[in-house]
């Protein structure tokens, strides 16, 4: 027996389709339609309610996973942290193009870096019968994955757990940020400010922060940290950042997330006469606007498209029981130095 997390009552060890129908307040036929991906005559409210009940009771892995293991749908479930940013767009493009070449289609979900949303995406996609998953995981994803017990191939990208035995592909974030920070030190910047989203949600963010701080500690340089999130406006960022810009000390601003770079630029363009000699600016990813503005902005460019292709390749190889590809890939970023960090010290 176990306690139903929805009602607090007791249920049998084996959750049945009748239990799901009762908890969701729908018929067994409606549950069956949901499990088979037939949503055309189903309201969004009903769909969401069933998704929630199935996720909370772990119904899928305990009852239908085994039956789905024996048929192939040529569907791949892709879970992205934030599908709106340019990095994610290129990742998805890489996954899609490689998958289509191999006869697969993808279903994409955005988790918003929430473990609960990751669970919902995974269980919902599993109910549709996907052959495997490609996931940008939060730091606690692997624990959840083991708990729900879905026996499907999975490939991590961008933020793999370093002790995971699963497939993964990532970029060399630590080394890239360390090298870029070292370049800033060599340019003559003496103080540093890092603007970052919560670094403890994604392994990638932690690697970038470690690369930044390790380099500065080694060079005995001072630095400050500004935390921001999706709700941070340019005005809010200005209030935090400007106090660090009033010193005569050459200061470099490192923006760790591509979706924060435009906000940092809006703040710093009011000081563009001081860029790059007094103020430096560096960010992440190959954003088109960064080379069009004056001064142009130095960026660390990730091979996002190639990372998406690699993730699809190693997953499909696993699905099809092939061993042609190395199961773990580390791709290299490059530093695209532009005017925002080229100090004229001569």
Question: What do the PLM-derived regions correspond to, one by one?
Answer:
Residues 169-194, 234-242, 261, 302-321:
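Hydrophobic alpha-helical segments within soluble ligand-binding/sensing domains
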Residues 87-101, 176-179, 183, 203-222, ...:
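Short, solvent-exposed amphipathic alpha-helices that sit
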Residues 99-110, 194, 213-234:
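Short beta-strand elements in bilobed, periplasmic/extracellular small-molecule ligand-binding domains
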Residues 10, 44-48, 57-124, 128-132, ...:
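Amphipathic helical "hinge" segments at domain boundaries
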């Amino acid at each position: 027996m176990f306690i139903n997390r929805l009602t607090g009552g007791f249920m049998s060890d084996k959750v049945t389709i009748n239990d799901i129908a009762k908890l969701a307040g729908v018929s067994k036929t409606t549950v069956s339609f949901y499990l088979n991906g037939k949503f055309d005559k189903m309201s969004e409210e009903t769909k969401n309610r069933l998704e929630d009940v199935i996720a909370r009771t772990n119904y899928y892995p305990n009852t239908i996973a085994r039956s789905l293991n024996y048929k192939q749908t040529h569907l791949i479930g892709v879970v992205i942290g934030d599908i709106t940013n340019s990095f994610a767009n290129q990742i998805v493009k890489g996954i899609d193009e490689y998958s289509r070449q191999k006869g697969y289609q993808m279903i994409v979900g955005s988790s918003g870096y929430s473990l609960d949303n990751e669970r919902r995406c995974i269980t919902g996609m599993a109910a549709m019968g996907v052959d495997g998953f490609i996931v940008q995981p939060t730091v606690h994803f692997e624990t959840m994955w083991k708990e729900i017990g879905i026996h499907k191939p999975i490939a991590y990208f961008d933020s793999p757990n370093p002790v995971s035995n699963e497939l993964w592909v990532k970029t060399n974030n630590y080394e890239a940020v360390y090298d870029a920070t070292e370049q800033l030190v060599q340019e003559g910047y003496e103080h540093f400010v890092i603007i970052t989203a919560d670094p403890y949600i994604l392994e990638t963010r932690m690697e970038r922060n470690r690369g930044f701080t390790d380099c500065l500690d080694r060079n005995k340089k001072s630095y400050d940290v500004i935390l921001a999130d999706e709700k941070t406006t340019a005005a809010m960022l200005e209030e935090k950042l400007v106090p660090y810009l009033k010193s005569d000390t050459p200061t470099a601003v490192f923006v760790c997330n591509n979706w924060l770079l435009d906000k940092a630029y809006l703040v710093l363009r009011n000081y563009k006469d001081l860029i790059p000699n007094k103020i430096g600016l560096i960010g992440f990813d190959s954003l088109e606007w960064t080379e069009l503005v004056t001064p142009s902005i130095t960026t660390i460019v990730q091979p996002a498209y190639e990372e998406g292709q690699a993730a699809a390749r190693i997953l499909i190889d696993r699905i099809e029981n092939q061993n042609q590809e190395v199961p773990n890939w580390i791709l290299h970023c490059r530093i695209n130095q532009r005017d925002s960090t080229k100090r004229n010290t001569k």
